[in-house]
Amino acid sequence: QAGIERFFVTIWPTALFTFTSEERRALRLAARGAYRFRKINDPRLAKWLIHRGGPSAVGGLETIQPEIARHLVKTSESLRLHGIQYIDEQLAECLIQHNGRTLYLDNLHHVDLEVLEILIRHTGRGLSLGGIENLSVQEASVLATYRGRLSLNKLTNPNSEILAALVQHTGKSLSLGSLKTLSRPQAQQLKKYRGDLYLRGIQELPPGIDVEFTDFPQ
């Protein structure tokens, strides 16, 4: 009997019964991928979601308190925080503890340099900053030190100086999905990259530019 009691305690923790009926309904829908939370104040909800909720359940969060983030980062999968438009240093310190696949922060349109210097310490496989359209050379140099896969898929027409900084990236891959074409100076910088380079927005190169990539690593 004691063994049976322990079994039920493991599967149905006491805290589960203290959720409101509205919270329980939201959790059931989230498990089926049919509900996205905009705000979470209860760490128990975050803990439940990260283990049993669908991956999109937290994608709509517009604000995250550090005590909530400490639970969310425990997922071994990608953490998609598409609703977050601003993070400070305290939240960044929590998010970099994510050790899963990719950390998606694609709704950040600007990130303070101090926060970038924290984000590059992210311990997961990849970092996606798909909302940033412009970078300074200094910011590009900081991002280049990130050791995982780096995605900057909204970066618009970076000049050769910024690309010169980015191609120093030491991680496995660099994705610049918004580039529609390449000038020769841009191509001359990008060919120096030694990882996997993803330029999915380019459908056709100007005449002669492809020659710049003749010796690009395969």
What are these regions (language model features)?
Residues L16, L27-L29, L113:
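Leucine-biased recognition of intrinsically disordered, low-complexity hydrophobic segments
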Residues L16, I209-D210:
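A generic alpha-helix propensity feature with a strong bias for hydrophobic helices
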